[in-house]
Regions:
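Terminus-proximal functional modules
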Residues: 4, 18-152
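Sec-dependent N-terminal signal peptides
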Residues: 4-14
């Protein structure tokens, strides 16, 4: 009987022990697709190669501490990045579905390459800044693909 109780207690203890947290590395790939009429905009798939630590460029504000962030833009700027040309949604004839299909093929190629390198597509988020009315004619469709990889 003692062995049965001890076995049950041991199994329960192992069942409720917390598992060690898994640590991941994240990478963001951004597509910027122009929705400017007449094909005048620029569309790109961007992936940073350089790393930055946000803490190096962060200041804390409070009622006691009123310092401001004096980081230089040149220190923040990432110069090492991959830039893949995408096609604009519009050309002189209006919306161009072939361009959208082309962009889909290029973005799919990037996603497949990342997955083959061991990354998992964790999140996708999109936003649009569109034409604000007569005379504006500007806009972008931006999508962020957030990948994660288990640290070894």
């Amino acid at each position: 009987m003692k062995k049965v109780i001890l076995s049950i207690f041991t199994l329960m203890a192992f069942g409720i022990m917390p598992l060690s947290a898994q640590a991941y590395t994240y990478k963001v790939v951004t597509s910027v697709e122009s929705i400017v009429p007449n094909g005048l905009g620029r569309s790109r798939l961007i992936s940073a190669n350089d790393k930055r630590n946000y803490k190096d460029f962060t200041s804390t504000q409070s009622s006691v501490q009123k310092g401001r962030n004096k980081s230089k833009r040149s220190d923040l700027r990432v110069k090492g990045f991959d830039e893949t040309k995408l096609l604009n949604f519009y050309n002189l004839g209006g919306i161009r579905f072939q361009n959208i299909a082309t962009n889909d093929a290029l973005i799919t190629s990037k996603i497949n390459a990342m997955i083959s390198e061991g990354w998992d597509l964790a999140f996708v988020t999109s936003a649009v800044e569109s034409d604000a009315g007569k005379g504006d004619g500007k806009g972008i469709f931006i999508t962020r693909y957030i990948f994660k990889k288990l640290n070894n």
